[in-house]
């Protein structure tokens, strides 16, 4: 079954929604964005989170020391690097599960995967001056038949109306959603529920 990651949790209500709906992963964004969260706030929220749900910290070009400190303080399960990080940078996180985001415009962008040794790749939409969470999709067909020796996580503009088609085309390990389960910038329980049900209903 395809796994689900809900990204950009910021409120206690978001944690309550997650505890009821049980996505496989939840993401906390430490990069400058409208979904950015402070470490202390994340610590409080994680203490309320169902222990079966894995935690993902999302970083964009964060200094190594800061990212390590946050990861250790929060005991994060996964570190997702969504910026211009290199393999040399990622080598500082050998004790962690690491996902690297690759922003996709066309098939040539898939070549970037050869530069990294990580646990998974997150394929997101290439948007100028933005690092994810834009609500825009890319052409999933570029991933059709593309094989890696690590799992593929699909992100970028997913929502309850398109996730089934996206999974059919890409057959990812997991799907990653943020704006697609929001209303006016906040997580929406009904949209989260519908999204997760759509994913888990696929056979």
Swiss-Prot record:
* E.C. designation(s): 5.3.1.24
InterPro entries per record: Aldolase_TIM (IPR013785), PRAI_dom (IPR001240), RibuloseP-bd_barrel (IPR011060), TrpF_fam (IPR044643)
Q: Output the SUPFAM superfamilies linked to this UniProt entry.
A: Ribulose-phoshate binding barrel (SSF51366)
Keywords for the protein's UniProt record, in alphabetical order: Amino-acid biosynthesis, Aromatic amino acid biosynthesis, Isomerase, Tryptophan biosynthesis
Which EC class is this protein assigned?
isomerase
One Pfam annotation reads PRAI
Q: Which chemical reaction does it catalyze?
A: N-(5-phospho-beta-D-ribosyl)anthranilate = 1-(2-carboxyphenylamino)-1-deoxy-D-ribulose 5-phosphate
Q: Which family does it belong to?
A: Belongs to the TrpF family.
Query: What is the protein's given name?
Result: N-(5'-phosphoribosyl)anthranilate isomerase
Q: Which organism is it from?
A: Thermoanaerobacter sp. (strain X514)
């Amino acid at each position: 079954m395809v796994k689900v990651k809900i990204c950009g949790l910021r409120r206690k209500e978001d944690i309550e929604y997650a505890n009821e709906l049980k996505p496989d992963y939840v993401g906390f964004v430490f990069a400058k964005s409208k979904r950015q969260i402070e470490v202390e706030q994340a610590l409080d929220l994680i203490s309320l989170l169902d222990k079966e749900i894995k935690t993902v910290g999302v970083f964009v070009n964060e200094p190594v020391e800061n990212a390590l400190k946050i990861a250790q303080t929060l005991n994060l399960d996964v570190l997702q690097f969504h910026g211009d990080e290199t393999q040399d940078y990622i080598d500082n996180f050998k004790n962690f599960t690491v996902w690297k985001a690759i922003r996709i415009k066309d098939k040539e962008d898939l070549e970037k995967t050869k530069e990294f040794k990580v646990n998974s790749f997150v394929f997101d939409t290439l948007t100028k001056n933005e690092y994810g969470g834009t609500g825009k999709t890319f052409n999933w067909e570029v991933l059709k038949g593309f094989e890696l020796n690590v799992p593929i996580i699909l992100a970028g503009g997913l929502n309850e109306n398109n996730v089934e088609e996206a999974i059919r085309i890409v057959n990812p390990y997991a799907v990653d959603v943020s704006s697609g389960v929001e209303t006016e910038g906040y997580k929406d329980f009904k949209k989260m529920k519908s999204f997760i049900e759509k994913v888990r209903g696929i056979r």
